[in-house]
A protein has these predicted regions:
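Extracytoplasmic small-molecule ligand-binding "clamshell" domains
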Residues: 20-91
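Short helices/loops that flank or line small-molecule/ion binding pockets
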Residues: 69-83, 96-97, 116, 132, ...
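A local structural motif
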Residues: 53-64, 79, 160-175, 215-218, ...
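Periplasmic-binding protein-like
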Residues: 29, 33, 103-119, 209-248, ...
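Pocket-lining segment of extracytoplasmic ligand-binding domains
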Residues: 138-242
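Sec/Tat signal peptide C-region and signal peptidase I cleavage site
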Residues: 13-19
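An extracytoplasmic/periplasmic, membrane-proximal ligand-sensing/linker region
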Residues: 21-32, 36-47, 238-304
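Flexible hinge/capping segments at coil-to-helix
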Residues: 122-143
Length: 304
């Protein structure tokens, strides 16, 4: 029979707590991108922030920036622990950190899909019904680090549609965000703009209609990309593995343990009929083609 002193027993009991990552990370910050206006994105992510705070037992803060690069650089500078990226902004973070990021989860939709689509929109009354009709017009991409708002449409325009944007359109610019691009199309600032949707019932402009930002029938889709893998929840690779797993596991159970909070987080509007069902584990291999595509785009720019 083995006997333990009181001191030894206390040490054994305390050992797991002594190694807990919370001692070094009493505050966790997660960054969110600028796809919608700041008030709405903060409101939509608040239920998840509160859930993580209660579940993990540490303070959780939301970090926002005026553009995608602000969140990417915050992660590269170790100012935030977690980022909710799109596929292209994840690839940008991967490059900016020399591979120092780890993706763990992406969105899982009720259909079983883990992807979405880049689209180009125009005003329905503009007479622009296809990309060919937009020759010489003003086109807006969303942000240089946006997957659906820039990288995918730019890549496909050149390699699939045989359109070089800088030569085909009269003007090529960046709107700064998806909502700003759609708004610019509606008010006539842009003739066309790149954004995203999940399907005909759910996407940026449909959600803007539901929020009363634009009217039904003002915006029409004129082009659609192949499916894009949804962007991942991403962690700095220099974080404790236990922290990464604990936060990932907490996000995974958010849909079932806070049903109302998840509804607010996932829908943007009560009219969304293709709700996000939850999350699915992913790894970097799912996004390597995006990294390669971004490198191709950079090479095209250098060559030009």
């Amino acid at each position: 029979m083995r006997f333990f002193t009181t001191t030894a027993l206390c040490a054994l009991i305390a050992a797991p707590a002594f190694a807990d990552w919370r001692e070094d990370y009493a505050v966790l910050k997660f960054g969110i991108l600028s796809g919608e206006n700041e008030k709405d994105r903060l409101q939509r992510n608040e239920p998840l922030r509160a859930f993580l705070e209660e579940k993990l037992g540490v303070e959780v803060e939301i970090f926002t920036a005026g553009n995608y690069d602000g969140v990417i650089q915050a992660m590269a500078a170790d100012q935030i622990e977690i980022g909710r990226f799109g596929s292209s902004s994840y690839a940008a973070a991967y490059t900016a950190t020399d591979g120092g990021v780890i993706p763990t989860l992406t969105n899982l939709r009720e259909s079983g899909a883990t992807g979405y689509y880049s689209i180009v929109v125009s005003r329905c009354d503009s007479g622009i019904e296809t990309l060919a009709d937009a020759e010489g017009k003003v086109h807006a991409f969303a942000d240089p680090d946006s997957t659906s708002g820039y990288a995918v449409p730019y890549f496909n325009m050149i390699n699939v549609e045989n359109i070089v944007p800088e030569e085909f359109f009269g003007t090529v610019t960046f709107s700064g965000s998806h909502e700003a691009g759609v708004t610019g199309v509606v008010n006539g600032t842009f003739d066309t703009a790149a954004t995203w949707w999940n399907n005909e019932a759910d996407g940026v402009y449909q959600r803007m209609i539901a929020k009363g930002m634009i009217e039904e029938g003002q915006v029409c889709k004129i082009w659609e990309s192949p499916e894009i893998t949804s962007g991942p929840w991403t962690f700095r690779s220099n974080l404790p593995p236990e922290l990464i797993e604990d936060v990932t596991a907490a996000i995974e159970v958010f849909p079932t343990e806070d049903v109302e909070g998840f509804r607010i987080y996932s829908e943007w509007s009560e009219d969304n009929d293709n709700n996000q069902a939850g999350f699915q584990r992913v790894n970097h291999e799912r996004y390597q083609w995006i990294v390669d595509m971004r490198e191709w785009i950079r090479e095209q720019r250098r060559a030009g």
